[in-house]
Design a protein with these regions (language model features):
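Short, extreme N-terminal leader segments that mark the start of a protein/domain
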Residues: 1-38, 42
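Core RNA-modification/binding signature centered on pseudouridine synthases
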Residues: 8, 142-223
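Short beta-strand-to-loop capping motifs
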Residues: 18-20, 78-86, 130-135, 177-183
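Ordered, soluble secondary-structure elements with a strong preference for glycine-centered loop motifs
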Residues: 25-30, 85-92, 183-188
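Short, charge-patterned binding micro-sites
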Residues: 48-83
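Ordered, amphipathic secondary-structure segments that act as subunit-interaction surfaces
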Residues: 71-127
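Short amphipathic alpha-helices in soluble, non-transmembrane regions
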Residues: 88-102, 138-147, 193-194
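Short, low-order "capping/linker" segments at domain edges
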Residues: 118-134, 217-223
Length: 223
């Protein structure tokens, strides 16, 4: 009986780190994943599909980014039917080739073998960057004394910013804030957090408009 079972096709799993900057930060989540499927197709590298009535490419990310936010450390996993040559000598050329079909500002910055599913290892915190027009003189005092306000997110839920902001680093007028992740590896909206700690009035229900006014970037993740 065992011989009658169809043999499983060998596959190769990779973790890909990429960035989205400039106008590509407005690329919707679904379109972004489609670009990855397309770039492997253009390179002649077949992507493995799921089985069943409606097969889908085995490309997985860690959740949709807020529209309009830059990222320098976004992750996806992909399962391929052909191995990639990711030796140190070939990796730069491979990343350049695979990034070629992407819109300007979107680029692969690393490829490595996937050791475990992304859902098995979520980040503990994320670091966001923003350069405001002005920084309140008492910002660090309020952080240290845990007197940041409670604000409302886009779902109408209250958020105590003191429970979310883990650290603040002011580097010549550019703020880097470390924000705690939930158990799914995501954080509260950095737009809402920056607005709250800086005393900027925004409508959390209209974050698409807010993202056009504030250039916030996700620069790193901590595990």
């Amino acid at each position: 009986m065992a011989e009658r079972r169809p043999k499983k096709t060998e596959s190769f799993k990779y973790k890909i780190t990429f960035k989205k900057t400039g106008l590509s930060r407005f690329l919707p989540h679904h379109n972004m994943l489609s670009f990855f499927e397309r770039t492997f197709l253009c390179a002649g590298i077949p992507v493995k599909f799921s089985e069943g009535f409606s097969p889908k490419p085995k490309i997985v990310n860690m959740g949709a980014l807020p529209l309009g936010m830059e990222t320098y450390c976004e992750l996806i996993s992909v399962e391929l039917l052909k191995p990639l040559d990711i030796t140190p000598e070939n990796l730069p050329n491979l990343m350049k080739e695979l990034s070629r079909p992407f819109p300007r500002g979107m680029e692969i910055v690393n490829i490595e073998p996937l050791k475990e599913k992304l859902s098995k290892h979520f980040p503990k915190a994320m670091v966001y960057r923003y350069t405001p027009e002005a920084i309140p003189a008492d910002l660090m005092e309020r952080f240290n004394s845990k007197t940041f306000p409670t604000v409302t997110n886009h779902r109408g839920q209250e958020m105590d910013l003191n429970q979310h902001v883990l650290s603040i680093d002011n580097q010549e007028g550019t703020l880097y804030i470390k924000v705690k992740c939930n158990d799914q590896g995501t954080t509260a909206s950095p737009f809402v957090i920056f607005a709250g700690i800086l005393g900027i009035s925004i409508d959390p229900a209209k974050l698409d408009e807010v993202s056009r006014r504030f250039l916030v970037a996700k620069v790193s993740m901590e595990w």
